[in-house]
Amino acid sequence: MRFAVLLALFGLALAARQSSVSEQYYRSGREYRYQFNGHLSAGLPIPGEENSATRIQSLIRIQPENGDFMRLQMTKTRFATSEEDRVLSFENMNEVPVSEKVEKVLSLPIRFSYRHGMVGEIEFSTEEQTWSSNIKKAVVNMLQVNLVKKGMSEKNEYETEHDNDFFLSNERTLEGECEVAYTKIEKSEKEQQWTKSINFEKCSLRPEIVYGRRYAEECNECRERDEKFSSTVFFYNITGTPEEFLINSVELQSKHMFAPVTEQKQLITARITNRLELVYSGEQKEQIEAVRNSDKKENLLYNPEHEIAEEKFAQTGDEKYLRRIPNYVDQGEIIRQQLNRLSKQTEQIELESNHVHARLVKSLRFATEDNLSSIRSLVSQKSEVVQSLYWDALAIAGTKVTVSHLLEKINNKEISPMKASQLMKILAEVRIPSEQIAQELHRFCESDIVSRSAVLRQSCWLSYGSVLNGVCGQTKNVYGSEITETRKQCTRQMKEKYIRELIEKMNQAESRYEKVLFVKAIANAGIDTSVVELEKIIRNQEVEKTVRMQAIDALRRLRLSMPKKIQNVLMPVYRNHKETPGIRISALHMIMQTQPTSGVLDMIVRGLEKERSQQVRVYTWSTLKTLSESENPAEKEIRRRVSQSLASIPVEEQKYLESKHKTFNWFNMQSGATLNWATIFSNDSVLPKEITASLETVFGGEWNKYLAQIGLYQNNLDSVLSKLLQKVEETGLEQLVVRGKRSSSFFRPAEMLRSLVESLRISHRQVPAMSPIAMIYLRYKDQDYAFLPIDIDTLPEMIRRVARDGQLDLSEIEKVLTQAARFTVAGSAFFHETVRKVPSALGMPQVMTSKMPTVAQMNGEVKFDLEPLNSDKFTGLRLRVKAEPHVASTHVCKLELFTPIGGQGIKLLHGGRIQAPIDSEIEINWEKKLIVKATIKSPEQKRHIAHFMTRPVLFSREVTMDKQMRQYPEPREKTIQLRENRFPIHAFERQYFEQTGLKMTVSGHYRRPFTTAFTLGESIMMSSSSLPRMLSLKEVVAYMSFSGFEETEMDEPRLLNRFYEKETELFETEKNVEYEQEDKEPKSSQLQSQIRKVKSEGKAYKHRVHMKIHTVGGPKTQEAECEIRALCDERVRFCRLNLDASRSPIQGESRQWQLKSSAEWLYPEVPSTMKKMLESRREWNAMWTGKWGSEKQNEVTIRVQGEQSSEQKFWMKKAEREQSPLTSGGQASRAAQLNQYNIHATYEVTPETEFWMENVYSMFKTYYFFSAEVQPKQNKENRIQCQITLEPFTRQLFNVTVMSPKEKLVLELENQQTPFRLPAVNIGREFGRVQSVRHVVKAVERQTRPECIVKSKEIQTFDEVFYRTPVMECFSVLAKDCSENPDFAVLMRKVSKRGEEKMWKVISRENVIELEKKSEEMSVRVNGKEISEDKWEDFGISQRGEEKFFIDAEKVTVEFDGFQAKIQMSSLYKNKQCGLCGHYDGEKTNEFRRADNEETDDIEEFSRSYLSKDDECEVDEQEMTNKRNYKVLREETSSSEEISESLIELYSEAFQSREAHHRLGRREDRQVCFSQQAWNKCLKSKDNKTETKNVHFKCLTETTRSPRISSVFSQADISENLSDVEGLPSLAEPSPHSRFLPCVIPSLSLSQ
């Protein structure tokens, strides 16, 4: 609409002229005059709102010459501006007078080649200025029209009619060399209308300059394809023919939209409308002067000379480039003014402080060395805060001049090393890097002052690498010199020189830290030539592993520019099974960052089938799985490729201590963020080798792969952990009696361990000697920002002195911590700054800037005290913090249009200021119980805490082109006032916490439109104020105390005794006689029996947590209190939890709000075998009652009973085949996971609570994850019953049935699984006696211990390799600590040659324990003496059940039933274990290591090496040499295969039990698939109605047990063969027209 009004005004103005147009085509010797009007505006994309506009008007004289040349002159040029919301005529705008010099430059003639409408070379006078030549190019650009279809690249796809024509061609225009689309319409025989459109998405060259995008990567998939951010369209009226023609009028419409945040929000728009109208053609009355000294020749492309001059000055500091910049202002005085203003602003940080600091940065970017030298004395007189902000401004400016000046200040020690280190971080993001700046940094990094400070040295070299990336790396920055110069800023010789210097530094480095530092500097540089040197480091096995892993990571900045090269380097490393898992996983991680092709992915997938390393296999699978589920639009293509490759991989179950990779996505439309989490484990450490968390974002079509990342890397920290734990244990043994007895003087277990090593010639299992190291690193914008190495070389001397003789020296701690520290910290930064310079169709530059200047200051004091003072030990500490932080930040989105009369534009300001005083004290005491007390004092005066605002501003500044200016031209600013009828103002004011005496007022106003989603707040203000002093709040006190493990008598259960009260039928369900036995007594009787048994044990422990918060002062004391009391028996089978809470009444309440609740739960007796689990019901019962409210009370009682579902009991019956009570424990453990929970709730609640409950209930019914089925049903009032059934194997599927008073609701997951295993109650877990925190930690640690199971002739190793070997009458070493100082050994032998009874011996540092079954009784000897049962517990021996005995030797535990045993060992013995239980390192390929630490494939040879022969035993050589006794049964197994096997059995049994209906099945590519629904069987004697249905299949991967899978087909009634159908998750298949009959096991109907 605005364009239409503008064109109408132009038409009226031109119609009023007495034009004389008598020509039909251009002829030499004639003159043609055009009226030129150009309108340039910037504003919000809201029609009818105010804009900042500039108008240029001129009379254009054109005189054709012979030989296809024309002369052009601009005359009567005028300028005008406006800030109105509509387009005005020139006379109604504010005309701006121009100087004679400007008018003279604009009137200089030009000469250009012009043939068939195409513009060639343009000649300018020597006096011509760059800005004026670009304006004249804009006029000439409107005359260019391709009449003869020169360079046509594509013909019209449609039929060409006689009056219509369309074609494409590549054309050089003012705005770039781009594809141009033409359309011609014939109006008459000699009159045509031409339309010309520039396609900016297909440009080979654009004079566009971009800064601040060095770290972003293009995300083509993130952009909306139908959105045009730049468009320019021409409309021509032409008479004549292509050879002889005349342009009567030209209209140009151009638009540029800028989206600084997201492409869905176009916040700022620039519009250009130009028009050329022929007003005269006829005789030349005055010839245009010839172009003087016409050696200055250019093409039609925009000339970025001014922008290049700015770049060159920033890069080199040469002042000659400043003289080429129009409107240059001497910066000396301006910097003085800004510093003085900044001094006033630092007294109270406000939003204006950001603007002052941003202007200071802008001025410094044009400052010369003389300017900075002239203000030395002024800076020295300023406060430390102002000086700190000034140093930051110099670093942010980032020019050669400011960088040199800053480094000089650091060398002169005017800036502290810590502050200098922070400045180096800012220099890493220098806006326009150059070779000169890099050289300055390199010299500084080599200086003495840097070498003396480790922190400064690290920052300097990392920043040097980042600057090199800007100079020689491949970034998205576009510099002006790249548009006009063919020579690149960085040559190959320069790249090789930089990398060679860093490699030499790395090779010369003596410490591991120094080597890692220079590798990280190379990583930051991201130069392509570094790949060769990094490959040498990666492939060199002699290089330390830490350095090699860092070298792999150093390839990350080249992942998209050199993907194939990186894959060629790292794929051999990944596929080399001799490499350590840590190296291989790092290689895989980097390969996946290159977004590999399907061929590379297939290689990785095929390698998984033969992969022996558990860590590598699991990490590879989790990485591929994560990528296949990625929501990041930047990974759309790689997600598709990975999904295809992943289809052939069986699901890999991930254990807790295994490598894995996870992502969490937050995406809306094409923008969002991804949080990545990865853990890498290795076979030489129980601790993770590396833990990383990274954040990547997609905004505005740009992908920031590593916006922020934090990681922890360690190597060989296990040795430190082992020593620490051993030290703690030894210290405790000196103070406490160790299990009652110690070794006698004649019986020395330690000597027995050593003699065992000597007799079997056991070699020490020891990882290669390597000093421990830990390293925490931070990355920002894909650059290594900082890293902290922790090893013996880098620890400060002060920390080394803290530990003396294994004890902490309190005097050293007090000396460091108790000194009160007063501090004043100030800093500033541009957290985000991007600049985009684009030429407009008027030949004037338009600059889009997005930045976020931030200024912060904090004054405060910190004091730390140890209590009590002057004591040998301390029992408490006190921390006092008093500070007042001030932070102000503004996000500025600005579009500025530069013209010969100044600059106009629009900016959006989003600012915030926070001033939050902190005055708090924390006291901690642990003498008798843990007590934490925190006191927070309130402000004594009224304070403004926070202020946020957002507003659009129009601005303009007037400058003169004809002279150098000495003062900064302050812009005139005007806030855009949005129309009230379209954007009404909404004001608000809220008050909070008035009752506490600390009234907080939140007030503000915002504008919200009626019809669109556009929201723009003008000002939103938040403030906090206190009441008058006599009533004001003084402080808030929070208190917490904890006491635990206080021994007491077992109390009578109070709730569970009432579990079946008045509800005798509760939870009684119909039994399935096929696999559930009839109970001899009801559930209620069973529960009472369990309660009596628990109570009879007598001993229990109570725990208490008390929390309270209250106010001091104010009109009334406000408080809230919570007390949690717990009581558990020592085996944690029964627990009671009481929670009491209260708070003071709040607004609308007159009474105190209170909560009183109690919960009890009871575990059944732990079943030792599957048989015992099947003998009777094993239920977990819990009950909770709660009562809460103020005036009105709510009361709820919930009963929960957990049990096995019918399906799980069926599986238990099938699995109950193992005769040994011990070896069926694994199956019993899985079966002990209760998968069905019956919940019964009764309630009496207030209407408000009932309304909330109904909302939650409705949300679940409509949640998109669920498929809901609702059946109206009348049930009892105030009662809800619910049944939750988990799929028992993977626990990633569940069904929920809810019975409310009015309906029955069935919820099922809709064709998907939960991303994690759902928690379930395990009635098989047994912690032993839990009497202290130490016991809790110990019990949890044992849950993750590896286990070795030893049967009569079969052994399952710690790494889950199954093999067969005979057991002799001589002792064999099963498990042993084979380190230099062994802690334990576990041995076993047969008691007799023909019997199966075994004798076990467990040797620890303290005792030798022997167990042997004699006459159905267990004989126990300790240190050679038989001991009675009442003393077993003193030595860690206990009996569990009737047949199992348990030995706890701290580092190792053994369960033994007289025949078979299970050994569990601490994970700290990774790579230190030896014996028949294998070489424990997490891998399955090297289990058979003989006693001399040599690997062998001969199991007999392996077994003999651990056979301890003596005079008391004899080896049966015939049995020993029988080869049939030795065999690897399964080298690897996985729970997924076990699950598949179990499912096969279940499906098989289900098929046999159904005769009325059948399932559909098909087989393909190592998979057997069954339909998830059962269907009525078609009877041949009847006519069947059929319809097409979608059949969902569950596919099981075939393993080595394929015959078992195949047998399902023969057992099941599968009459339909679907082998002719491709592998699709959902198939269309005819089925009988009848209702669905549920499967015999519906909870096992897994979704595909």
Curated annotation (Swiss-Prot):
Domain VWFD: 1346-1514
Annotated stretches, region: Disordered: 1070-1092
Annotated Pfam families: Vit_open_b-sht, Vitellogenin_N, VWD
Keywords: Cleavage on pair of basic residues, Disulfide bond, Glycoprotein, Repeat, Secreted, Signal, Storage protein
Any one of the GO CC terms: extracellular region
Site positions (Cleavage): K741, R742
Domain Vitellogenin, residue spans: 26-691
Disulfide pairings: C178-C203, C219-C222, C1348-C1477, C1370-C1513
PTM section of the record: The precursor protein is probably further processed into vitellin polypeptides VT2 and VT3.
Principal subcellular localization: secreted
Positions annotated as glycosylated: N237, N371, N683, N1295, N1584, N1617
Classification via PANTHER family: VITELLOGENIN 1-RELATED, VITELLOGENIN-RELATED
Role description: Precursor of the egg-yolk proteins that are sources of nutrients during embryonic development.
This protein's name: Vitellogenin-6
Species this chain originates from: Oscheius tipulae
Lineage, uppermost ranks: Eukaryota, Metazoa, Ecdysozoa, Nematoda, Chromadorea
